[in-house]
Structure formats: C-alpha cells, structure tokens
C-alpha cells in the first residue's frame, strides 16, 4: 500500500487536530485503564475535533505506520477507470444507541457532507447500495485516491446521517460514547464495553476534555496535576517545574503531557503530527 505523505495530510486540513506518534520503548505495550484529562483552548475548535474523533469513525483510516486501512470499511476496489468504486462495510458494528450500522447511515452521512460542498467529496455523482453490505461510488472523473479521501477525519459516519449533531447528541460507532458535553466548554465520554477495535485501540476508560482559554492557566493545570495533557504553544510555565513530554518537540510543540501518559512510538521518519486520534492511541503508563 502507498504511504500517505505528511504534507498531503496537512494540505487536506486533517492535520489541524493530528495528535499522535512519538517515541516510546518497543517493550512498552498499551494497557487499558485511567481517564485522560485534556485541557484545550477555546479558539481553533480542538475540543470539537478531538471529541468527534473519539465518538465517530470514518470508512477508512491512516494507521500509525502511515498505511491506509479499513475502519468501517473492510475492503474496496475500483474499475480500471477509477470512476466506480465498491466499498464493503464492516458487519460487526453498532451505534452508541444500540442500532446496527446500516449502509443507509453511511450513504446519508456522505450525502450530508457532499451537500455542504465538502471538497473531499468533490466529483461524487452517486452513492448506491450494492449486495446489502456494500456501497458503490460513482465519480464524475476517475480518482485513484478516493480511499485516502475517505480517511479524512471530517468525513465521519453518523446515525441517520446526522453529521452536524451537537457534542451532547453525537451518535457514532467510535470507541467512546458521550456521557455529557456542552459545546465550547467541556466533553466527557466513556469507553464502550465491546468494540471491533478491542485490543488494538481505545486504552482509556474515560475521557475528560475541558476548555481553558488562557495558555498560562492550562500550563498550571498540567503542572499541578489537574489535567494529564494540555494544548500549549510553548513550554513556558513548565520548564523547571516538573518532567513533561513535549509533542512533537519542545521547540515546536502543540501538546505537553505528564510522564504517566504514553504516546505511540515514532515509526520510520514520519513526522509527529500524523493522526488526530489521541483518544485511541495514547495510554496511561
């Protein structure tokens, strides 16, 4: 499979919330447990992006090693022109309300994105159900990159296609289900007991995201142990005040985390900001 170029990710807009992949020991394996407490700024929409990433899935995803793999899709293929694609859907999936994932939910979600002029679905002519568990995509022009486009974190699949639900009412198929939330202020979610990603992702038992506008106050909250991870532009307020992991680096940081929070090891020469799925791929030491 082709690796997804980091610059392409940034150009797609997905990098705005990409939050995973830096070095830990190969021997350090993920384990379940704990609540991730994350402080984010009010500006930039990070609360919503991380929350949506926890609650929703896409058809495909970019794995930590940079390869494309299925998420709600288990496979895909196109004709020679790359104008017609067949995407086969996973069958062992249910929404947080207990209802099974249906092809109609996928079609309604993608049509909702397309109706809003989403450029990632530019050139999409039709979506139709095929054989009960697959969807046919018909494009205006051939596009061999369609499976990568479907991995974009904005193209979430929601129950009944309600892709613009408020934080409190989001109903997805992701690892975490909403417990309570208020747009622009806070978000709490709990790990689903059974999920098709069990054993490979979703290591926290619960998530607590809180908006703190002032960067100095976010740093103080991290320093004093009130949160585990804070979105920070610089390490000011942390230097000499404890031991922290700076992500992607101290000189060019987006996040700071306590030493008890483990980030996936860096693979090859990929950059650190390669995936938004902090809630899936980080864990507590």
List the predicted regions and their residue ranges.
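Extracytoplasmic/periplasmic ligand-capture domains
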Residues: 4, 28-29, 64, 90-119, ...
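C-terminal segment of N-terminal export signals and the immediately downstream linker at the start
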Residues: 23-41, 269-272
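N-terminal lobe/hinge region of extracytoplasmic solute-binding protein
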Residues: 37-80, 111, 171
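A structural "hinge/loop" feature
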Residues: 39-53, 72-73, 99, 146-154, ...
């Amino acid at each position: 499979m082709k690796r997804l170029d980091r610059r392409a990710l940034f150009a797609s807009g997905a990098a705005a919330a990409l939050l995973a992949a830096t070095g830990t020991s190969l021997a350090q394996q993920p384990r379940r447990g704990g609540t991730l407490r994350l402080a984010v700024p009010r500006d930039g929409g990070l609360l919503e992006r991380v929350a949506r990433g926890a609650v929703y899935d896409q058809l495909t995803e970019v794995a930590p090693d940079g390869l494309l793999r299925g998420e709600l899709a288990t496979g895909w293929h196109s004709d020679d022109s790359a104008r017609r694609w067949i995407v086969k859907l996973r069958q062992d999936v249910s929404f947080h309300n207990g209802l099974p994932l249906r092809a109609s939910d996928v079609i309604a979600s993608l049509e909702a994105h397309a109706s809003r002029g989403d450029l990632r679905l530019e050139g999409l002519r039709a979506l139709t159900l095929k054989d009960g568990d697959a969807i046919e995509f018909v494009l205006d022009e051939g596009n061999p990159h369609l499976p990568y486009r479907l991995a974009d974190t904005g193209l979430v699949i929601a129950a009944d296609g309600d892709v613009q639900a408020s934080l409190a009412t989001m109903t997805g198929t992701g690892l975490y289900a909403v417990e309570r939330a208020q747009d622009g202020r806070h978000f709490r979610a709990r790990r689903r007991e059974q999920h098709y990603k069990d054993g490979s992702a979703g290591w926290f038992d619960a998530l607590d995201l809180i908006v703190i506008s002032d960067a100095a106050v976010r740093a103080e909250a991290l320093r004093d142990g009130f949160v585990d991870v804070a979105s920070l532009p610089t390490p000011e307020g942390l230097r000499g005040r404890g031991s922290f992991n700076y992500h992607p680096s101290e000189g060019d940081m987006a996040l700071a985390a306590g030493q008890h929070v483990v980030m996936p090891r860096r693979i090859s020469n990929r950059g650190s900001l390669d995936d938004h799925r902090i809630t899936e791929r980080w864990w507590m030491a």
